[in-house]
Amino acid sequence: VTTTGRVVVAGGCGAVGALLTVALRAAGREVLVVDPAADPTTPGMLRADLTAPDTALAGALGDAALVVLAVPDVIAGAALPVLARLLPPHTLLVETLSVKTPIAAALHTYRPGAPALGINPMFAPDLGLPGRPVLTVRHHDAPAADEFVTALRARGATVVETTADEHDRITAAVQVLTHAAILAFGIALDRLDVPGVAARVAAPPHTVLRALLARITGGTAEVYHDIQRTNPYADTARRALAEAVADLDAATDALPDFAALLDRAHTALGDGCPAAAELCAQLFATLPRDPGAVSSREERSRT
């Protein structure tokens, strides 16, 4: 980011905030991390409440050229009226919320015409930016927003630009639906109460689903809850999943019906089917021959 001036990263002690703080400092920017969990004895950190700023935070916001909102949607919504009062009109506001249509409307209300950019890293922050997809929404475009997007690309991110509505429709499929399907698999597995040896004899699809289940259930409940709760298309996505299971159940009565269901599912991949099949083959080739043994070694290492 070439624009000069102080950067304030609200929520900089969280995973996304920390990721962006590192990237901004690597680009030579002076970054102030603002977070209720910040260590006030550490340079460049301020312990403060964004929704009720003290004198120090109010001064920092008033001097900021860029403010990053790496906070939950509830806090971001409560902070917007405060930011509208304290931020200079030229300050670029970058929000990292997982749902964009509500914040887009709020920005139009509280900072109409002021520079604002939405970003959504579509990966766990511990994986790093290089080679990872980032969705962006230009709420109110400005040269500073161009520079921020260019900086993301310079750090190796694959930037995909969308509108706020397109963003939420995309994430309803790739996050809401995906997470719901994996969690439903885990709940069904628990209900079946299968013998523990199942993990050691499982075929690759089951092994991969177990790995995905471990990844999600080992994460932060608030993050996954926000995705399922706040996306305006979340109910539609979960309903589509439930209806698909009902369609599958009905199609098991006759082979032609089941074949038609397979064709319909295949159609959802579109032109990306060959690439997806190749990716699956590569993924399966990397799996251990005895995935249950991997679990056993991990369990022994924790004891």
Range-by-range predicted roles:
Residues L255-T303:
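C-terminal non-catalytic accessory extensions
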Residues L86-I103:
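ADP-ribose/adenylate-binding Rossmann-like module
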Residues R132, H167-G218:
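Active-site-proximal catalytic alpha-helix in oxidoreductases
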Residues V1-L57:
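NAD(P)+-binding Rossmann beta1-loop-alpha1 motif at the extreme N-terminus of oxidoreductases
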Residues A199-A275:
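Interdomain hinge/lid region at the active-site interface
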Residues V99-A164, D168-T171:
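Rossmann-fold dinucleotide-binding core
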